[in-house]
Structure formats: C-alpha cells, structure tokens
Amino acid sequence: MKYIGAHVSAAGGLANAPARAAEIGATAFALFTKNQRQWRAAPLTPQVIDDFKIACEKYHFSAAQILPHDSYLINLGHPVSEALEKSRDAFLDEMQRCEQLGLTLLNFHPGSHLMQIAQEDCLARIAESINIALAQTEGVTAVIENTAGQGSNLGFEFEQLAAIIDGVEDKSRVGVCIDTCHAFAAGYDLRTPEACEKTFAGFGKIVGFQYLRGMHLNDAKSAFGSRVDRHHSLGEGNIGHDAFRWIMQDGRFDGIPLILETINPDIWAEEIAWLKAQQIAEAVA
C-alpha cells in the first residue's frame, strides 16, 4: 500500500498538521516539529504531545505514515568543532521531540564540508553525529535525505549515502529518503521508465532498498545533472509524469511515506489524487 501526502504546515499547533493532511486526501504527511529556521524551541508540553497523538488517531495516521523533517540550520558534518556540537545538540533535540510525539522517523539533510575538510572526513562526521543521537534515543530512525549536491552539500551520490550508513553502528535505525528532484539534479535520470529502472537498480545495489524509509516526490525546475535544487509541480518540470507513475506502480515503494514538496500547495489535493489513480491503474492492469 502506498502512503501518499505532502509536507504540511503545523502553524497554530502540531495537532493541526494531521488535519491539514486529511483535508487534501493524504495518507501520509511530513512536518516540522519546531520552527525550522531557529536553533532553539520551547520543550513540548504534555498537552501538545497529547493533542498531536489524538489528532493522528482521529485522522488515521500511524507513525509509519509520518516523516518529520529537522531544522535546515543543522549541519552534522560541520568542519568547525563548536558549530558541529551546536548541530549535534539540535539534532538530538529533534530526535527526542520525535520520540516524545510517538514518531519513528526523522528526515534530515546529511551535511556540508564547506570546502574546509575532505569529503571522506565530512561523511565520517555525519555518521558519528548519527551515532551520538541514536545512543541517546530509542525507537526513532535517522533518515538521510539525498541532496542535489548544491554548494558543498554531501549526500548527492548513492555512494555517499552508503558511506554514511556504513559508519552508523545501529543499522536498524538508519535509513534514507530519496528526493526525486535532488536525484535528477545530481545526475540520476528519471525521465523514462527505463531510466527509473536503471537509477533504482543502482540504488538497490549501492545502498539497498532495505534502507529506503521515505521519498520526496518532486518534479524539477533545474536541469538534469545541474546540481541545483529547484522543485516543480508533478509533470510540469524536467522529469515529467512517467517517473511518478512508475513509482506508484512499483511495489518496492509500498509502506513508506511518499511526500510532495512541490511548489504549489493549492494543487496538492489534485496531485495526491493523480498519484493514487496511477496506483489503481496498476491494480486494474
């Protein structure tokens, strides 16, 4: 079964996120559990936690259907020790918030070397950062998102994701989220079913589908291999509809949150309905 949704706003309270997801016909959603552009946030109160859990139950969202995203400020591979510690503390707080909310996944961008340390050293720092957070939490999986490779961001090659996973001690609590726009911008072709087969065969060989814990379904304004991260609405960008139809009709993408971060929230309901229809087309066939 496919869990399909979007990254919805939690404005006005975390309990509003499941309601907003239900409004657009979603069977999955992503959210920020705090302001993503601030380092610090007030601790979650028992009332906030209870309200969120009640809302998730009301709208029939289990933890497997929810993919929280951490703060954009965090860099788990930061080359400067003081800044690295600040990021590690913030990441641990994000993991603990998920733990408190009964959530089992935390999606994050791996990190950037800022042209100050070697790629290998940065990847090792990211893995160490994950180990530190996992050792102090229970039940939450660290879900590494592939990047477009903009600037000095790492995680744009499957080999880099595999290297991070290799350095994580508890393999049962690490996974990946593949963003289609990021993959395309990083040079992984998705424009035809044949291209999708080839790209994900490579993913299966290098990373492994056992680590796939979520996806971001985004078309790309950016050009193939441009290393530029610019999302677009499904079918409106340089990837096209075929990739998303192919994903909907492949069982390897069942049972994980498939999240839209496309640029027009006004048509998320339509995009979700379209994705669901592709799944039905498979069943009919």
UniProtKB/Swiss-Prot annotation:
Task: Identify the cofactor(s).
Answer: Zn(2+)
Q: Any idea which positions bind Zn(2+) 1?
A: H69, H109, E145
Keyword Hydrolase, does the record have it? yes
Tell me where on the tree of life, at the top rank, the source sits. Bacteria
Q: Does the keyword DNA repair apply?
A: yes
| Note accompanying the cofactor annotation | Binds 3 Zn(2+) ions.
Which keywords appear in this protein's UniProt record, sorted alphabetically?
DNA damage, DNA repair, Endonuclease, Hydrolase, Metal-binding, Nuclease, Zinc
Q: Tell me one GO molecular function of this protein.
A: DNA-(apurinic or apyrimidinic site) endonuclease activity
Annotated protein name in UniProt: Probable endonuclease 4
